Amino acid sequence: MKKIVKILSVIFFLLIVAVGLLIAFIVKDVWDKTTNINKYEKYLGVEGKYKENFGIYNDIFPDTIPENVEVEDFCYIYYNPWDPCYLGYLVYTCDSETFEEEYERLSNITSSEEIYIYGTTDFPYELCAVYTDDYTGCIYALADTENSRFIYVELQYCNFFNDIKYMEYIPNEYLPIGYDATMGNPYRTEMMRKLYEK
């Protein structure tokens, strides 16, 4: 009897360790967030771990932060509860020469033809470059010419909605006007209806 209790105790212990390791493995890649601009290149630099998502190489965001700019805000979040979601934004002001150089770089990017997705009717500042996909979201850069300021935003996700509550992280003034990628958004509702009709 003692031998059976020992064997069961060892099995129970190993089972708990296995479950703990499984949870640790799953949780470690579920959430990755930074607001530390010193980590920018680690996340979005040329070799950044989130420079390419869903087959889209993010050349809209700069590869490096120019030395002569004043970063106003930065946030990057990777979240993967079941499917990956990416949220990022960078806001900086710069001198007129840097502004003109970056404006030209962005203007030379071949943007998506369809820019108004998920209810978007316009953008709050001049749109310089944009990648959109009606399934996975958008990446775009805005120019606030009055203040020599650039705003870069990434909102990428799966299944026609963003698991990240993006409105809690990105100020509304940087989001497309009318944009709705919440779980119950009208575009997702329509796409799911069409999917289930087939």
Label each residue range with its predicted role.
Residues 16-17, 65, 103:
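Prokaryotic Sec-type signal peptides and long signal-anchor helices
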Residues 1-20:
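N-terminal Sec-pathway targeting helices
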Residues 1, 6, 40, 57, ...:
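Aromatic-residue detector
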Residues 102-198:
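Extracytoplasmic electrostatic interaction patches
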Residues 2, 77, 144-145:
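Alpha-helix initiation/capping motif
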Residues 5, 12, 25-26, 48, ...:
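Generic low-complexity, intrinsically disordered sequence content enriched
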Residues 7, 46, 51, 118-120:
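Residue-level signal for well-ordered alpha-helical segments
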Residues 21-98:
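N-terminal export/targeting and maturation segments
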